[in-house]
Amino acid sequence: LQKEIIDLKLINEAALEFDLPKINAFDNEIKELGEIKYDFNDFNIACYGFKIKDDIKSKIKAHFISYENSDKNNGFSLLQLNPELSYKMAANIILDAYDSGADFMVVNQAKDFYMFDTCSKKLMQSSGREFKDFYVLSYFEFLSLIQGIKNPSLQNHDLKVSLI
């Protein structure tokens, strides 16, 4: 959609640029799975925009749920142009995961974390629904938790994480 808007010269491309604030959830040394200390047994996990590798799935006991909007555009690219539309798009995705039974969502990109966690209050306002008991983790935070490491970035989440 963003490319189509720019191609049609309906808006200046600079108007769509957004400087993403620093997100500590992606500051992590852990890039791959080590010793498993917490297997997430009985947890339903939603992933947004990527698939968890099969070798990780085989080592933990979590159930990875599928949901309709797992690969849909979350509106980040339109945030500067139309914030309300962006919040509605992101709210539809996170609520789809929530309504599909996920206990939390794992994201692999800082922009996705920003939309789902940092903007969570705006998403709740936009949708008229609460999901304060739902969490969003970066992939690196998730790998850390599997290994029993509580990353300090968990304390900076807008949706407070109290999994372990």
What are the roles of these predicted feature ranges?
Residues 1-164:
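Iron-sulfur cluster-binding electron-transfer modules in prokaryotic oxidoreductases
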